[in-house]
């Protein structure tokens, strides 16, 4: 008898029909004595050789869907096909009677002879070794197929020993714990992400504030540059007035004039009049001169170098006074000075 834990070799595909359709029906009331599994024709003849006449056995056929009835005749062993019909009945080809089971077929031919030899079935041929039956492989294979159909996933796992599975599970635990620790550390180190809608709102607000911030920065830069330019230009002009050649000339030409000191210090007055050219203002402590006197003073004291300096001051002041709300208006030409600050023609009165 084969070992209980060892599976038999797989049956040929032509025997699958027996395992799936006939095994339960055949073993319902116990396996009959005349059934010998899927033995070959030669093995069947060897078993019947020592048996009396009329001894028979039934085996699973290897050539068709059905069985083979083998019995011992007077001269030799005879073999008849037993076909399994579509409705589940059994019939020997050439006969007209179909039987519901193999037991019914055996009982029928124990009473009526098999054509054409007209011989009856007398007694079944039993197993040669009852401890090692020849149909055991079929039943083992049928049980294995039934278990695999019931639980196809757990069948391979049961074949491996349990200690190995326990050892593998113990080895896998540290790696799983390490993975959990690393995932926790990664989640703790990463800052919480803000929702997408909140991020969009922040971005939109910053984009809205860009033009206003740019305008404020531009105004601050303009005011800073204007103050720096004015302060530097005023310092340069004061140094040139104190130590320049224009001062000596004015003092020599007007040394006898009591107002020569005032005229030598008329540049700050001119600078203040540039801030509001339309309304020139004179110092309070001196008399207001006539138009001709102003022209003569401007002609005497204003030189080409002074004119360029005045132009730079006017440009700086105009850029400082320009504001965003006046951007649409046309700017006045910075190069055009009032008539009082321009050089008079060569033959104008008061020209010297």
From Swiss-Prot:
Write the record's keywords in alphabetical order, separated by commas.
Cytoplasm, Nucleus, Phosphoprotein, SH2 domain
Where is it predominantly found?
Answer: cytoplasm
> By its UniProt entry, which InterPro entries does this protein fall under?
HSH2D_SH2 (IPR035047), SH2 (IPR000980), SH2_dom_sf (IPR036860)
Q: Where is the composition biased (Basic and acidic residues)?
A: 283-295
Its Gene Ontology cellular component terms are: cytoplasm; cytosol; mitochondrion; nucleus
Name of a matching Pfam family: SH2
Which tissues does it occur in? Predominantly expressed in spleen and hematopoietic cells such as peripheral blood leukocytes and weakly expressed in prostate, thymus, heart, small intestine and placenta.
| GO BP: any one term | T cell activation
**SUPFAM superfamilies tied to this protein:** SH2 domain
Residue ranges of domain SH2 in the record = 34-125
- The UniProt regions of compositional bias labelled Polar residues, in chain numbering, are 180-191
Q: Which PROSITE patterns match?
A: SH2
Point out the signal peptide segment.
Answer: none
Q: Name one GO molecular function term.
A: protein-macromolecule adaptor activity
Highest taxon of the source?
A: Eukaryota
For bias type Pro residues, the affected ranges are: 343-352
**Which locations, inside or outside the cell, does it occupy?**
Cytoplasm; Nucleus
Outcome, altering residue 135 to F: No change in the ability to inhibit RE/AP up-regulation in response to TCR/CD28 stimulation
Region annotation Disordered: residue ranges? 157-199, 241-352
UniProt PTM = May be phosphorylated by FES and ACK1.
Alphabetized PANTHER family for the sequence: HEMATOPOIETIC SH2 DOMAIN-CONTAINING PROTEIN (PTHR14388:SF3), T CELL-SPECIFIC ADAPTER PROTEIN TSAD (PTHR14388)
Role: May be a modulator of the apoptotic response through its ability to affect mitochondrial stability. Adapter protein involved in tyrosine kinase and CD28 signaling. Seems to affect CD28-mediated activation of the RE/AP element of the interleukin-2 promoter.
Q: How does it assemble?
A: Interacts with FES and TNK2.
The protein's name is Hematopoietic SH2 domain-containing protein
């Amino acid at each position: 008898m084969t070992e209980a834990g060892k599976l038999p070799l797989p049956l040929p595909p032509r025997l699958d029909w027996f395992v799936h359709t006939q095994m339960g029906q055949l073993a319902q009331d116990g396996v009959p004595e005349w059934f010998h599994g899927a033995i070959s024709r030669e093995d069947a003849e060897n078993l019947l050789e020592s048996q009396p006449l009329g001894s028979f056995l039934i085996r699973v056929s290897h050539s068709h869907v059905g069985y083979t009835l083998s019995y011992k005749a007077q001269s030799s062993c005879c073999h008849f096909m037993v076909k399994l019909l579509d409705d589940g009945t059994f019939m020997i080809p050439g006969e007209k009677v179909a039987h519901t089971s193999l037991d019914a077929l055996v009982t029928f031919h124990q009473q009526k002879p098999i054509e054409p030899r007209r011989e009856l079935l007398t007694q079944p041929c039993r197993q040669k070794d009852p401890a090692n039956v020849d149909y055991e492989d079929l039943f083992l294979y049928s049980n294995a197929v039934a278990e695999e159909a019931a639980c196809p996933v757990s069948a391979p796992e049961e074949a491996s020993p349990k200690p190995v599975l326990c050892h593998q599970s113990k080895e896998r635990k540290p790696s799983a714990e390490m993975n959990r620790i690393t995932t926790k550390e990664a989640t703790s180190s990463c800052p919480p992400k803000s929702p997408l809608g909140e991020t969009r709102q922040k971005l939109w607000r910053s984009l809205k504030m860009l033009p206003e911030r740019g305008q404020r920065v531009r105004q601050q830069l303009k005011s800073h540059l204007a103050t720096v330019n004015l302060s530097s230009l005023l310092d340069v002009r004061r140094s040139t007035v104190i130590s320049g050649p224009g001062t000596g000339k004015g003092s020599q030409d007007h040394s006898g004039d009591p107002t020569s000191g005032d005229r030598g210090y008329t540049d700050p007055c001119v600078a203040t009049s540039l801030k509001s050219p339309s309304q020139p203002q004179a110092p309070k402590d001196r008399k207001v001169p006539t138009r001709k006197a102003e022209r003569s003073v401007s002609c005497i004291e204003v030189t080409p170098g002074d004119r360029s300096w005045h132009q730079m001051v006017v440009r700086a002041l105009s850029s400082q006074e320009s504001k965003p709300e006046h951007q649409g208006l046309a700017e006045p030409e910075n190069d055009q000075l009032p008539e009082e600050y321009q050089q008079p023609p060569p033959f104008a009165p008061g020209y010297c």
